[in-house]
Amino acid sequence: MEKIRQVKTEEDVIHLLQVALEHEWAVSFEYVVHAYSMPKGRFLYEDPVLKQATDARAQTIQIGIDEMYHALQLGITLARLGVDPGFGTDEVVRHPLVGDNLRRDKMTEEMVTDLYQSAEIEPGAFPEIENMVWNISFDEVRHIAQFGAMIDAVEAAFGAGAAGYPPNPDREHRGDLRLLHGLNRLENEAMHRYLKYVMMFNAHQDLSQRLFKNSVNHMRHWDKLSGLLVRLGDVVAIENAVTDAAGVERSRLPMPAAYPGGNRLSALETLPDLERGLVAKYEEAVALDLPEEVRAQLRLHLALTREHVFTQDKLLANARRIKGVV
């Protein structure tokens, strides 16, 4: 990760935020991928902040959600500075061993904490941004302590060789897995496309909050689908990953790097068809011969996505109806 020590100008601030944003996008995805490679409830540790026994998988998911909110804060700040935040990411990596993933997570947090806390921002020049950076940095300090405790507990109980769930080698030959992976890709894209528009329209409280609600729904669907894949004997895929001889997966493009829409109308025009595409895929999925608990979860996703179709149709119609809305 690039080191940025002197931040004196607006250009310096933008560069700092862009470097940080690429990190935050990556880990908001990577930590959840690591979490769903762990068995639920198996890797317990004493959390140094929560002060109680905690499931490493559950807390790693929560840390990933923290990072998504960091990305949103950074992106909105960049948008207010007149800069397209972008969706480029640092490299996303998954190791076969749980301990290796957790060590990577802790190392990554240490690197980004150094980025935030060692950046010497010109005193008084950008006080709100400086305050945000320090606030985010102490979330990362907490994450370092939590990942460290996870590593110690996992290796004390299971040694260094505790393996995570591997990708299912038959996923390309199983229609159910292909369909759920396809849904996961669409949910990941939908979540980030909505976040792009939340950042674009951050000054429009009504629109941005409606879009943010849908983004959170898609994030939850992606999270639940990742759990369903484990239930069906697979793990969430890392898009565009290359796997080496040791089974380590790496990707620099775990999600689309660009999304359409440059103003309110052109952005809103993209969303009804996105939601209808998801509805069609969910309707296909609930018709499969799957365990009832899986189908029940998919039906919940389908119902909420139908609500999104209704909402996005009306948001688009209203944007077309009212003159002067930009």
Where are the regions a protein language model picked out?
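Non-heme di-metal
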Residues: 1-326
